């Protein structure tokens, strides 16, 4: 055995590749072993070092793969089982136990996270050369007993199913130990690179190979200064020191110091030595020169997007200088956080890259299909789960328009639960739906699912057969084939991997659960968890790509240019935590009680030395230039500067602040069309808030001119954010069809309010006729109609019964009317709403109870009112009352709070009550002596009082009574008849002259709106009260109206101070009237 070490400025790959080449020339078969995470990059690096760039005698691989070479054809091996298979085995085992059988884990036996922890522990036991029986140092005897029960039963099932119950490395070691491979091990050399520790399983294998006389060469990085030191704790080389010293002691071999022909730049050598001195408490006189600082830089950036943008620009610059993509390595502090930004921005800059991290299959349509199918069963046919299943593209032969109609009906009829999905649809909205076609589609879609779902607990093979029948009935394979037609080779390979994962899980289920009785829900849960946990196996599509991976997988001298992103304190260093079923304390006790080659790894104990060595490797990862970037905001939160970067700053490494300047005339902008186009669009969307130099003005004017020429050739235009809220005039033919010239224009008070809220809202509702999707569930409209009907019946009841009897009778009659019975007895939610409405009716009815001088003249009085033969106003008055003096009043029931506001009325937003007064005066043919005492709202509610604001309990009835009163506008002459407390008269009393003025101005509002509507030009002008915010309907999804950009288009309401409001607005109305008179 040879143990080699070298200073980090030298290249260990060159040294070990040379040793491998010498052994190959001597006729040896050489295995060059690298860690799992580095094997791909290591293979390329080693082969590039060899003069021939290839060798049949040297195999670059991993420990486990090397074991396969020797035991691949051994007849005693069992069938391989993957993690999904192990999950199934543990699930089967745990299902066989009762809660009482497992004293500690009994309540967790169906928990998916717990099962995954068991699988991890199972694999860790194999890697640690331990058995479950050696877990005798646990803090709880019951915990040990449970684990022994579980793992013993697992081993029994694996043996009975002829599965591998040991790893390939363990089987290889066993064969070596028994002498079955002595011949194969002759003339064998093993070179090991990139390790700072071995697992117990790997170390045991190395010991057995060493005993058989196999040449073993192990290399690592240690400085001579560190090797000679007697104290290594805290040293940046502690991980490799402990590693090499442990091997030297065990195998009685003295480590040798070696050097390579290649040596790193002085900048990186000095940086390493300064970093080492910081942690071994020694003095160093080394200083980074200005030339050294050109090779190592820290970038201080604003956020992740800016960070990746700057890196992408720098990569483009390297290409501009003649370098290749493969010369660049990008390292990430948090790979998950950067994956999306890297993908979007590198694509924009046309940078091909390989992301060295497993990609989940979870977004594939087949995984969506399995996920939705399981959720349909688990949640008993929720509408969203059923529709997601149908939308997967793999279910049946459903056309998109059929799917849209089905979804619309499911939403309308609130179809949920298998009972509703399996029965004919019967509810209709006045003929809106084609129930015959929908029920035909429902039967086609639901029949296969109905057959599958009704499966009772049975043997696994029987469930598989029924699933196969289901998949055939819905044409899954044909749909999958159509799905993958015409895709790229990369996508094709991904589709094949997903399908293989799907079939392998089913095969393993057949093997493990074939003769076991289980429920369909459990089977679908296993299938879903397996598919969601699966990852794609990805390899670079090309050699010339930028490699992107996590920084903790880096090695010294990895590439010419290295960018390390996200180097904040949260991720650099990374603190690994133990989340397994065996605590660190228990692991330490077990290690003390077992031999050296049988031990648990204690990752938390390794954190410090591993992080130091990783940081040292990172600082030496580049051979020409290293850039470490530090975002001020990472994952939408501020983070601190890494302690390692603070050390570098103290050593003199420069920190460059990278701002967000997108206007600079840089060469990389010229060399990349997509990035230039993207930046021009970005600039076009935002105001340029800085002055450009003459050089920058020239650059951008030439760049934009070039882009316009290129886009014109391709028939493209630069998209713009529309700062103009301009609409097209509706065609004259459309307006003539909608509003014939020879007929008056139909309006209502609600239509008028809509017009003055936002003219475009009126266009959508009354010209296009757009409506919100309805449902059978009662909404505010249904609630209002219900309460209207109750009060209508109460007021019509002329019997001698007391008021409460009349009210209860009215509620009972209303509840049994078909229109309400159908709506409010659909489900518990509807019945709950009905109970609330009954309470509201009883509370509000107290206004009508007792001594009341008012008599109901009529209910639901429809009217038509003509204005100048040009406008026809239609509406329905809820109730007309008559006072004892014969004057009439108007009552409008409201399910929400409403009052007559003079300011809103002036601005066209509250015309209802005044319109009703005009309609009553016109329809009843009232003369000048007939009076209308008022028009008012009655808020139907169950008043709630905040007791915290009550000064005394006696005030509660007064407050409640105040809330349950008529609010609107009242005639001053009738004030004496309205003083019974049921009418809110404060600031609501108007003289007859003032009422006439309101009526006249109301007509003006209608005429003005009708004139604008006839033109067919509808503005996007939601109203604003203060000119700073918008209160009107903005219709953002349609108009893209944004208050900060389009405020000039909003209609600012005319407002007056509170004290001047009444007289001021009346004066304005009078002046408008006089202006009209003068014009005439």
Curated annotation (Swiss-Prot):
<dbReference type="InterPro" id="IPR011335">
    <property type="entry name" value="Restrct_endonuc-II-like"/>
</dbReference>
<keyword id="KW-0227">DNA damage</keyword>
<dbReference type="InterPro" id="IPR049035">
    <property type="entry name" value="ADDB_N"/>
</dbReference>
<dbReference type="InterPro" id="IPR011604">
    <property type="entry name" value="PDDEXK-like_dom_sf"/>
</dbReference>
<dbReference type="GO" id="GO:0016817">
    <property type="term" value="F:hydrolase activity, acting on acid anhydrides"/>
</dbReference>
<comment type="similarity">
    <text>Belongs to the helicase family. AddB/RexB type 2 subfamily.</text>
</comment>
<keyword id="KW-0067">ATP-binding</keyword>
<keyword id="KW-0234">DNA repair</keyword>
<keyword id="KW-0269">Exonuclease</keyword>
<dbReference type="GO" id="GO:0003690">
    <property type="term" value="F:double-stranded DNA binding"/>
</dbReference>
<dbReference type="Pfam" id="PF12705">
    <property type="entry name" value="PDDEXK_1"/>
</dbReference>
<dbReference type="GO" id="GO:0008409">
    <property type="term" value="F:5'-3' exonuclease activity"/>
</dbReference>
<keyword id="KW-0547">Nucleotide-binding</keyword>
<protein>
    <recommendedName>
        <fullName>ATP-dependent helicase/deoxyribonuclease subunit B</fullName>
        <ecNumber>3.1.-.-</ecNumber>
    </recommendedName>
</protein>
<keyword id="KW-0347">Helicase</keyword>
<dbReference type="InterPro" id="IPR038726">
    <property type="entry name" value="PDDEXK_AddAB-type"/>
</dbReference>
<dbReference type="GO" id="GO:0005524">
    <property type="term" value="F:ATP binding"/>
</dbReference>
<dbReference type="InterPro" id="IPR027417">
    <property type="entry name" value="P-loop_NTPase"/>
</dbReference>
<keyword id="KW-0378">Hydrolase</keyword>
<keyword id="KW-0540">Nuclease</keyword>
<dbReference type="GO" id="GO:0004386">
    <property type="term" value="F:helicase activity"/>
</dbReference>
<keyword id="KW-0238">DNA-binding</keyword>
<dbReference type="Pfam" id="PF21445">
    <property type="entry name" value="ADDB_N"/>
</dbReference>
<dbReference type="GO" id="GO:0000724">
    <property type="term" value="P:double-strand break repair via homologous recombination"/>
</dbReference>
<comment type="subunit">
    <text>Heterodimer of AddA and RexB.</text>
</comment>
<comment type="function">
    <text>The heterodimer acts as both an ATP-dependent DNA helicase and an ATP-dependent, dual-direction single-stranded exonuclease. Recognizes the chi site generating a DNA molecule suitable for the initiation of homologous recombination. This subunit has 5' -&gt; 3' nuclease activity but not helicase activity.</text>
</comment>
<dbReference type="InterPro" id="IPR014141">
    <property type="entry name" value="DNA_helicase_suRexB"/>
</dbReference>
């Amino acid at each position: 055995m040879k143990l080699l070490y070298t200073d980090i400025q030298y290249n260990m790959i060159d040294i070990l590749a040379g040793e491998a080449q010498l052994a190959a020339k001597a006729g040896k078969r050489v295995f060059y072993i690298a860690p799992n995470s580095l094997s791909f990059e290591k293979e390329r690096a080693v082969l590039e070092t060899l003069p021939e760039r290839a060798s049949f005698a040297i195999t670059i691989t991993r420990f486990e793969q090397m074991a396969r070479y020797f035991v691949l054809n051994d007849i005693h091996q069992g069938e391989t089982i993957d993690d999904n298979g192990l999950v199934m085995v543990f699930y089967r085992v745990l299902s066989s136990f009762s809660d009482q059988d497992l004293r500690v884990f009994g309540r967790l036996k169906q928990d998916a996270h717990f099962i995954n922890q068991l699988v991890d522990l199972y694999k860790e036991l194999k890697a640690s050369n331990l058995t479950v029986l050696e877990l005798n140092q646990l803090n709880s005897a019951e915990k040990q007993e449970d684990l022994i029960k579980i793992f013993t039963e697992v081993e029994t099932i694996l043996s009975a199913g002829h599965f591998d119950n040991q790893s390939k490395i363990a089987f290889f070691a066993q064969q070596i130990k028994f002498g079955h491979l002595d011949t194969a091990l002759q003339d064998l050399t093993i070179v090991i690179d990139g390790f700072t520790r071995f697992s117990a399983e790997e170390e045991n294998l190395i010991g057995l190979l060493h005993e058989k006389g196999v040449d073993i060469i192990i290399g690592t990085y240690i400085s001579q200064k560190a090797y000679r030191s007697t104290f290594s704790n805290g040293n940046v080389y502690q991980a490799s020191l402990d590693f090499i010293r442990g091997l030297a002691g065990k195998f009685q071999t003295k480590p040798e110091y070696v050097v390579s022909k290649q040596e790193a730049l002085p900048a990186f050598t000095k940086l390493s030595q300064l970093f080492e001195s910081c942690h071994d408490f020694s003095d160093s006189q080394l200083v980074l020169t200005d030339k050294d600082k050109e090779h190592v830089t820290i970038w201080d950036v604003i956020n992740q997007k800016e960070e990746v943008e700057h890196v992408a620009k720098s990569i483009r610059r390297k290409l501009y200088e003649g370098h290749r993509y493969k010369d660049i390595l990008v390292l990430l502090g948090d790979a998950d956080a950067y994956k999306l930004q890297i993908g979007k921005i590198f694509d924009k800059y046309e940078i091909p890259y390989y992301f060295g991290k497993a990609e989940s299959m979870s977004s594939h349509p087949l995984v969506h299909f399995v996920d939705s199918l399981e959720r349909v069963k688990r949640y008993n046919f929720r509408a969203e789960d059923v529709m997601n299943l149908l939308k997967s593209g793999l279910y049946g032969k459903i056309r998109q328009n059929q799917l849209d109609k089905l979804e619309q009906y499911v939403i309308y009829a609130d179809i949920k639960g298998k009972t509703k999905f399996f029965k004919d649809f019967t509810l209709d909205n006045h003929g809106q739906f084609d129930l015959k076609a929908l029920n035909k589609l429902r039967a086609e879609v639901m029949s296969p699912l109905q057959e599958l779902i009704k499966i009772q607990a049975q043997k696994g093979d029987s469930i598989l057969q029924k699933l196969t029948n289901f998949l055939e009935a819905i044409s899954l394979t044909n749909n999958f084939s159509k799905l993958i037609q015409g895709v790229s080779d990369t996508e094709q390979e991904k589709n094949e991997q997903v399908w293989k994962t799907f079939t392998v899980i089913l095969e393993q289920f057949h093997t493990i659960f074939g003769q076991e009785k289980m429920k369909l829900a459990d089977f679908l849960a296993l299938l879903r968890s397996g598919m969601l946990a699966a990852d794609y196996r990805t390899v670079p599509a090309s050699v010339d790509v930028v490699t992107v991976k996590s920084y903790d997988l880096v090695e010294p001298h990895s590439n010419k240019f290295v960018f390390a992103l996200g180097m904040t304190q949260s991720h650099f260093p990374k603190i690994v935590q133990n989340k397994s079923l065996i605590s660190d304390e228990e692991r330490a006790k077990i290690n003390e009680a077992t031999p050296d080659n049988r031990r648990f790894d204690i990752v938390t104990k390794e954190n410090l030395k591993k992080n130091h060595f990783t940081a040292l490797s990172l600082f030496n990862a580049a051979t020409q230039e290293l850039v470490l970037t530090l975002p001020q905001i990472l994952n939408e939160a501020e983070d601190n500067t890494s302690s390692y970067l603070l050390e570098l700053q103290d050593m003199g490494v420069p920190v460059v602040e990278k701002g967000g300047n997108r206007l600079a005339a840089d060469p990389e902008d010229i060399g990349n069309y997509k990035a230039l186009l993207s930046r021009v669009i970005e600039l076009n969307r935002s105001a340029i808030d800085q002055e450009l130099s003459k050089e920058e003005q020239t650059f951008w004017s030439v760049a934009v001119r070039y882009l316009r020429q290129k886009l014109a050739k391709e028939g493209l235009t630069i998209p713009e954010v529309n700062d103009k809220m301009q609409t097209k005039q509706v065609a004259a033919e459309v307006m003539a069809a909608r509003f014939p010239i020879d007929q008056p224009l139909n309006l209502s008070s609600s239509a008028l309010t809509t017009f003055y809220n936002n003219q475009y809202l009126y266009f959508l509702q009354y010209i296009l006729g757009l409506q919100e999707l309805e449902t059978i569930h009662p909404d505010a409209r249904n609630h209002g109609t219900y309460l209207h009907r109750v009060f209508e019946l109460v007021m019509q009841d002329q019997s001698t019964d007391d008021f409460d009897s009349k009210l209860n009778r009215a509620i009972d009659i209303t509840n049994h009317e078909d229109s309400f019975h159908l709506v409010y007895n659909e489900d518990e939610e509807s019945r709950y709403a009905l109970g609330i409405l009954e309470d509201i009716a009883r509370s509000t009815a107290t206004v009508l109870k007792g001594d009341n001088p008012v008599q109901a003249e009529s209910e639901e009085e429809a009217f038509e009112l003509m204005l100048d033969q040009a406008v026809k106003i239609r509406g329905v008055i809820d109730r007309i009352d008559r006072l004892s003096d014969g004057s009439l009043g108007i009552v409008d029931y409201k399910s929400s709070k409403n009052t007559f506001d003079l300011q809103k009325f002036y601005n066209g937003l509250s015309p209802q009550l005044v319109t009703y007064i005009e309609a009553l005066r016109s329809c009843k043919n009232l003369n000048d002596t007939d009076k209308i005492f008022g028009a008012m709202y009655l808020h139907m509610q169950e008043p709630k009082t905040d007791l915290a604001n009550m000064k005394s309990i006696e005030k509660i009835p007064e407050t409640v009574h105040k809330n349950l009163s008529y609010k609107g506008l009242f005639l001053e002459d009738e004030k004496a008849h309205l003083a019974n407390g049921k009418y809110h008269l404060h600031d609501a009393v108007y003289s007859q002259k003032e009422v006439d003025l309101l009526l006249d101005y109301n007509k003006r509002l209608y005429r003005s709106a009708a004139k604008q509507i006839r033109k067919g030009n509808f503005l996007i002008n939601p109203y604003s009260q203060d000119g700073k915010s918008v209160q009107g309907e903005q219709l953002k999804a349609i108009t893209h109206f944004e208050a900060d950009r389009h405020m000039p288009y909003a209609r600012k309401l005319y407002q007056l101070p509170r004290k001047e409001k009444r007289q001021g607005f009346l004066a304005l109305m009078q002046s408008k009237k006089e202006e009209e008179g003068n014009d005439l």
